[in-house]
C-alpha cells in the first residue's frame, strides 16, 4: 500500500450475519496499525434477514467515510445472494472475498464465519497479524475469543 493511498473496503451481507461487527474489527485493526480510519454503515433493513453493508476506509489521511461507487479495493460478502447486489462497489481489479472463500464446516462456531472471512481479507492487507488479534479480542467477550481467533486463523491460512 502506498503511503498516501486510501484502502477502500466494503463488507456486505444480511442482518444478523455480523457485517457491522466485521467492519468494526477491520476499522479497529487499521486504527491499531496507526492509520486514519473512517467507517460508515448502511443498515437498509438491518433486522435479521435484510441487506446490510458497511464501508471502511483507511490510510494516512481519510476525509470521507463512504467508499465511492466502483472504488472498493475489497468486497467482503458474507451471504451468497449479496454478491451481485454489491458487486458494483468493487473497482476493476478489486478483490471479491465471498462466502466460498472459507469452508464453514471447519468452524467450531458457525457464528464466527464473518471473522473467518476477515482472516482471508488479512492476507491481502499490510496490517500485522497482532493488530488483527487485538481487534478481535476487543470486539468479543472473553468466552468467545477462542472460537473467533480460530475462525480468523482458518481464513488467514486459507484452509
Residue ranges and their predicted role:
Residues 1-159:
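Active-site cofactor/cluster-binding pocket
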Amino acid at each position: 500500500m502506498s503511503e498516501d493511498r486510501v484502502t477502500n473496503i466494503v463488507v456486505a451481507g444480511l442482518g444478523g450475519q455480523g457485517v457491522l461487527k466485521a467492519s468494526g474489527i477491520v476499522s479497529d485493526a487499521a486504527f491499531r496499525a496507526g492509520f486514519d480510519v473512517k467507517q460508515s454503515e448502511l443498515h437498509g433493513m438491518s433486522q435479521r434477514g435484510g441487506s446490510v453493508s458497511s464501508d471502511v476506509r483507511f490510510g494516512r489521511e481519510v476525509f470521507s467515510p463512504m467508499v465511492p461507487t466502483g472504488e472498493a479495493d475489497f468486497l467482503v460478502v458474507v451471504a451468497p445472494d449479496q454478491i451481485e447486489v454489491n458487486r458494483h462497489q468493487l473497482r476493476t481489479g478489486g478483490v471479491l472475498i465471498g462466502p466460498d472463500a472459507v469452508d464453514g464446516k471447519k468452524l467450531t462456531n458457525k457464528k464466527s464465519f464473518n471473522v473467518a472471512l476477515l482472516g482471508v481479507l488479512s492476507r491481502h492487507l499490510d496490517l500485522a497479524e497482532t493488530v488483527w488479534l487485538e481487534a478481535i479480542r476487543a470486539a468479543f467477550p472473553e468466552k468467545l475469543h477462542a472460537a473467533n481467533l480460530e475462525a480468523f486463523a482458518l481464513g488467514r491460512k486459507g484452509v
